Amino acid sequence: MIWRRRDMARGLAAVLIAAVGLVPLANVPAAAQSSPVLVFAAASLKNALDDVAAQWSKETGKQTKISYAASSALAKQIEGAAPADVFISADLDWMDYVAQRKLIKPESRANLLGNRIVLVAGKDSKAATKIEPGFGLRPLLGDGRLAMANIESVPAGKYGKAALEALGVWSSVQDRIAQAENVRAALLLVSRGEAPLGIVYQTDAAADPNVKIVGVFPENTHPAIVYPVAVLASSANPDAAAFAAHLRTPAALPLFEKQGFTVLK
């Protein structure tokens, strides 16, 4: 009888422990148990988008996981069925690329932000110039190279090349280009002193204290810089549309403006 009582006591204790272990799960909010929103975003968005995502998580209790890279690389990954919920490109071309392949939800697409491209140098550089037709870019480089994102596929590189062609100076520097995989990598070349000059977004320059802006390229020298956003067609995450919509709210837009982006209405 004594042993039976002990066995019953042990069994009851086990049931109670199991029940206690289940209580925290029952009390976890549904938002905390939902899957993170997987975001593919242009590298130039990192500082601002990190702030916006943190704000959204604080307000909703929901999480994001953001992969930053060149828009071209991200679009190709999306085409290859990489798991993602939201895509933010640094130009219209790569958003069009995935849209033409029916990889986004068309009704979710919106133009979010604008930007400028600038010529940057190291913070202690004495380089100075006025960006105008025929300006002396080659002499400013000396024996160094001009850092740019890939000029054939990455938006910042394409914008930069278009501007240099429009200003009539591309032919003088085309053999002095140091191409990087994305605009932040190009910025890093200048920031580290590995290239005397670079062409990056104005927002990138503002994010790095080791560079300074030498000049701003006139907007009429290159296609308009537009950052579109869309939810991917393959996304089954119910929070994806909510996050994409949050990017255009009065709470989020000032965080983009703080980093130097232009808000598109």
Description of each model-found segment:
Residues 1-23:
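Twin-arginine (Tat) signal peptide motif
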Residues 27-83, 89-92, 96-115, 120-265:
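Exported/periplasmic ABC-transporter solute-binding proteins
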